[in-house]
């Protein structure tokens, strides 16, 4: 594939509540392809595997919480990056609140196996 200015956008959703709506919004905005991975926050994993009274207390507090996150990554032309980010903001809302998620991007220097 001819290399153009490409980006990878990572979105970690702490709740699956918005996943279907986000995928529909991506599709209607011309954002196609991507990968969705089940993921787990490091704090949850540490609590699950740690010993001691403090961790037992935290484990009890977190037991009713979300077991997994959804991590979406999209490889897309740089000119579609802002569109993809806006889709996330419109569907998920402000990511700066507590336990909503995180979104970040990187420039890609090389891609193999990506089809149009």
Q: Over which residues does each language-model region extend?
A:
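Positively charged, small/polar-rich N-terminal and surface patches that mediate targeting and assembly
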Residues: 1-116
């Amino acid at each position: 594939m001819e290399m153009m200015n490409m980006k990878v956008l990572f979105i970690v959703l702490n709740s699956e509540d918005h996943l279907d709506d986000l995928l529909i919004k991506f599709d209607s905005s011309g954002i196609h392809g991507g990968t969705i991975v089940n993921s787990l926050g490091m704090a949850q994993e540490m609590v699950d595997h740690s010993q001691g009274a403090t961790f037992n207390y935290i484990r009890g507090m977190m037991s009713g919480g979300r077991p997994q996150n959804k991590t979406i990554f999209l490889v897309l032309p740089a000119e579609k990056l802002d569109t993809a980010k806006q889709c996330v903001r419109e569907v998920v809302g402000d990511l700066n609140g507590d336990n909503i998620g995180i979104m970040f991007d990187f420039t890609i220097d090389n891609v193999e196996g990506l089809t149009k």
